[in-house]
Amino acid sequence: ISIGLVGSEMCIRDSLVAGRETLENIQFIGAVGGFSNSDVLGSAKGWAGAFKYNEKAKKALDNFFTRKDTLSIGICNGCQLWMELELINPNHKRHGKMTFNDSKKHESAFTSVKIQKNNSVMLSSFEGSTLGVWVSHGEGKFSLPYNENKYNIVGKYSYDKYPHNPNGSDYNTAMMCDSSGRHLVTMPHIERSIFPWNWAFYPPDRKDKFSPWIIAFELSLIHI
């Protein structure tokens, strides 16, 4: 999904591959979950290949991430895509990868994350908050080759042991963004946790129409 100057639209990968879409008029793109290519080649590997090995698609995406007026979010499969394309820490000589959960199985669960001090456009105002959220992935482990201070970690699982940390991610990482704070990746599905009735547990004394996660998307719209 992409959000342009006059609203939102579906921006299909095939349009980028064919050169029909260049992202020039787009300011916000979301790469979302969905087990692209059925994960036959590994998580988001086939999806990433469509960008890596197609000149038109690669140019469109590279130009988008080079611009200073853009935002993006990669959720689950989209997180795996942005990490596979090395878009979050482009200056690193060794890049983090998304690898198999330590449990060696797919994990679908309701857990919680604690938002760290961060400069993320979408989540900086959440600093110190602990919020419930769904996860659903088989390759959700952030395998990070450098020390923690080399990464802009936005959110961590509230507890570092399984099953609260469902994948064994290095530094308990659940969410990360680039140095500018404009490009966010998250394995937890914040978009599946928008409504209180999405949550496995929601405080009964609260009568919210939306969960706090909606604010992240509101902030992205305000920014652009």
Residues covered by each model-derived region:
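Flexible gly/pro-rich beta->alpha loop and the following alpha-helix that scaffold active-site loops
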Residues: 9, 13-73, 79-93
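Single conserved hydrophobic/aromatic residue that forms the stacking wall/gate
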Residues: 1-12, 222-223
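Amide-donor transfer/coupling interface in amidating biosynthetic enzymes
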Residues: 18-21, 25, 58-65, 95-221
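Short conserved micro-motifs on helix faces and helix-strand junctions that flank
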Residues: 4, 68, 73-74, 134, ...
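Short, glycine/serine-rich, charged loops/turns that create anion-binding
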Residues: 77-79, 190-191
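Composition-driven recognition of long, C-terminal low-complexity regions enriched in serine/threonine
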Residues: 4, 49-52, 183
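Beta-edge loop/turn motif
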Residues: 76-77, 137
